[in-house]
Amino acid sequence: MLWLLRHAEAADGGPDDERPLTERGIRQAEAAGRALQTVGANMDVCFSSPKLRALQTAQLACAPLGVEVIVDRRLAGEPFDLKELTAGQGDVLLVGHDPSFSLLLHDLTGAQARMKKGGLAGISKGELLVLLRPTELSAIAGQRVA
């Protein structure tokens, strides 16, 4: 299973690579991790963009899952070779940015969907199985992010 998690809400201003999550973004990332835990998602590894907002999202979401976060520059926003990145891995969580993730979602599944900040997609064998907004993730996690 391939999971795509778009970074949660980040602060405006400052250098793009260094924008941290807002308080709301922190809650969104924590909710994503709890929701994944609640549904029994089993990731072998998490790859994250090096941009601060994505890395913080990955660390917060992966904490309850006990999954290692590996920083990979290919997820910083440009198109990347998914097969090369995930070769030899089982179930993978990628944490990154749009428009790359929405384009990847379309390329893999044909879905015409745009991922929201803090949104999660689950893909298996070219089929989009899950597409959740942050509010839906927080409901699954049993917490409020607003």
Locate the predicted segments by residue.
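Domain-level recognition of soluble alpha/beta enzyme cores
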Residues: 109-142
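Active-site-proximal alpha-helix that buttresses catalytic centers in soluble enzyme cores
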Residues: 1-79, 87, 112-115, 119, ...
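A short, amphipathic alpha-helical segment
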Residues: 34-37, 106, 124-125
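A polyampholytic, Gly/Pro-enriched intrinsically disordered region
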Residues: 88-101, 130-146
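Non-DNA-binding regulatory cores of transcription-related proteins
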Residues: 87-119
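Residues that scaffold the ATP/ADP-binding catalytic core of kinase and kinase-like folds
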Residues: 14, 104, 131
